Amino acid sequence: MISNNRLRIAMQKTGRLSDDSKDLLTRCGIKINLHKQKLIAFAENMPIDVMCVRDDDIPGLVMDKVVDIGIIGENVLEEEVLNRQVQLDNCSYTKLKRLDFGICRLSLAVPINIEYNNIHCLNHTRIATSYPHLLKRYCDKKKLTFKSCMLNGSVEVAPRAGLSDAICDLVSTGATLEANGLREVEVIFFSKACVICKTGFISLEKKNVIDKLMTRIQGVIKARESKYIMLHAPIEKLEKVMNLLHGAENPTILKLAGDNTRVAMHMVSSETLFWETMEKLKLLGASSILVLPIEKMME
């Protein structure tokens, strides 16, 4: 049985967000033994319990206050909000943080042999989807009349099977659409993974754990977005070197032993350092340029 004194987190058991969610908790220093056979896992070093469930159950578990925190895709979250609004059910939650994984878009796609000029080409058509409420909201805004064909999987095969004229489904790279003779024509919703929290009373003990967890999550994301840069540069070119390194904090500048014309620069940059930038740095006289990943970061 899950203790009321421990923070309860719901995450996807298997699927698109599962591995990234597990990796996030691990990088946050939470020691937890997650198995596919287990519904609940208990952290060893923090008062945290993790429930591994279907992704479309997570919003409801948070909104019904069964768990305190959920890691979920915004597409699933928004679909459940719209569903609960129709059912006149509670759909309250607090979004704590958008994450840096689970990036996708919900799009309309049509067979490649169909002429498409604008959204009204889909008027009075049948559209297959796993997201009927998001689709309806978008089509209502566009004043589009359509018939929904609800499918819980393999939506991309619906036109070829004669079930629909078009589909509304998640797209990451577009490779699945192309493999099934479809092309993306409209994006109706952009989505990333996010951390959500229940509304209402939360004990001080749990609030402290949430604050600690969110600080660590922010540190993990910041570290993944940043690089540690070290280089040697001519003193007279320092300003030009800094101008090339957009997104970098004020550098640490150190004297080089036996060289009064050059210094060592150490800095954290929040932007990707491309080969072209490194080549420009070299033209300015920089040398020994190192770009290193950052494992952990706290501001």
Curated annotation (Swiss-Prot):
EC annotation from Swiss-Prot or TrEMBL: 2.4.2.17
One Pfam assignment: HisG
Gene3D superfamilies recorded: 3.30.70.120, Periplasmic binding protein-like II (3.40.190.10)
Subcellular locations according to the entry: Cytoplasm
Record's keyword annotation contains Kinase: no
EC class name: transferase
Required cofactor(s): Mg(2+)
GO cellular component, one term: cytoplasm
Keyword Cytoplasm recorded: yes
Keywords recorded for this protein, A-Z: Amino-acid biosynthesis, ATP-binding, Cytoplasm, Glycosyltransferase, Histidine biosynthesis, Magnesium, Metal-binding, Nucleotide-binding, Transferase
Regulation: Feedback inhibited by histidine.
Molecular function terms, GO-annotated: ATP binding; ATP phosphoribosyltransferase activity; magnesium ion binding
Catalysed reactions, as listed in the record: 1-(5-phospho-beta-D-ribosyl)-ATP + diphosphate = 5-phospho-alpha-D-ribose 1-diphosphate + ATP
One GO biological process term: L-histidine biosynthetic process
Pathway(s) where this gene product acts: Amino-acid biosynthesis; L-histidine biosynthesis; L-histidine from 5-phospho-alpha-D-ribose 1-diphosphate: step 1/9
Family annotation (InterPro entries): ATP-PRT_HisG_long, ATP_PRibTrfase_cat, ATP_PRibTrfase_CS, ATP_PRibTrfase_HisG, HisG_C, N-reg_PII-like_a/b, N-reg_PII/ATP_PRibTrfase_C
Record family assignment: Belongs to the ATP phosphoribosyltransferase family. Long subfamily.
Function (record text): Catalyzes the condensation of ATP and 5-phosphoribose 1-diphosphate to form N'-(5'-phosphoribosyl)-ATP (PR-ATP). Has a crucial role in the pathway because the rate of histidine biosynthesis seems to be controlled primarily by regulation of HisG enzymatic activity.
Assembly notes: Equilibrium between an active dimeric form, an inactive hexameric form and higher aggregates. Interconversion between the various forms is largely reversible and is influenced by the natural substrates and inhibitors of the enzyme.
NCBIfam families (alphabetical): hisG, HisG_C-term
HAMAP family in UniProt: HisG_Long
Protein name: ATP phosphoribosyltransferase
Organism: Buchnera aphidicola subsp. Baizongia pistaciae (strain Bp)
Lineage, highest ranks first: Bacteria, Pseudomonadati, Pseudomonadota, Gammaproteobacteria, Enterobacterales
Gene name of the record: hisG
